[in-house]
């Protein structure tokens, strides 16, 4: 590969997609910190509180895996109108995992911010 060329498929969009994919599990747990939500509410919450646009085909496998790991519980609730909804809640283990993930993320992002600050300042992105 010639100096200065990027490997095939190594685009900012692809990199951002990988970053988001890694953050969705923590975001799903965080969305349930305040209480019980059903799947579509989790998706809407993530969209309203962050830049994470998560599709149903992405969130439900994650929720199922987190439930299988004992981090979430779920309960079907009959709706007054329409179909029953599956509501998800954090277990004590899920709350503990979220606290550990949030601490690790905080340390990681602070370190990265320190590294990127001079780059962003030079580009005029930061004052």
Which residues make up each language-model segment?
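Intrinsically disordered, low-complexity serine/threonine- and proline-rich regulatory segments
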Residues: 1-27, 101
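Amphipathic alpha-helical dimerization/coiled-coil segments
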Residues: 3, 96-127
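N-terminal helix-turn-helix DNA-binding core of bacterial DNA-binding proteins
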Residues: 16-60
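Short polar/acidic secondary-structure junctions
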Residues: 51, 77-79
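Short, hydrophobic-biased segments on the C-terminal half of alpha helices
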Residues: 60-67
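Glycine-centered, phosphate/nucleic-acid-interacting loop/turn motifs that mediate DNA/RNA or nucleotide
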Residues: 70
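Short beta-strand "wing" residues that participate in macromolecule-binding interfaces
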Residues: 74
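Basic, amphipathic "hinge/linker" alpha-helix immediately C-terminal to the N-terminal HTH DNA-binding motif
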Residues: 80-102
């Amino acid at each position: 590969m010639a100096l200065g060329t990027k490997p095939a498929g190594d685009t900012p969009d692809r990199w951002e997609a990988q970053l988001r994919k890694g953050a969705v599990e923590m975001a799903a747990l965080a969305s349930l910190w305040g209480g019980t939500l059903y799947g579509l509410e989790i998706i809407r919450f993530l969209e309203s509180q962050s830049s994470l646009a998560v599709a149903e085909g992405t969130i439900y496998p994650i929720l199922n895996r987190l439930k299988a790991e004992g981090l979430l519980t779920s309960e079907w609730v009959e709706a007054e109108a329409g179909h029953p909804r599956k509501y998800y809640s954090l277990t004590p283990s899920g709350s503990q995992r979220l606290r550990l993930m949030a601490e690790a993320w905080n340390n990681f992002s602070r370190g990265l911010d320190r590294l990127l600050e001079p780059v962003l300042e030079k580009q005029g992105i930061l004052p």
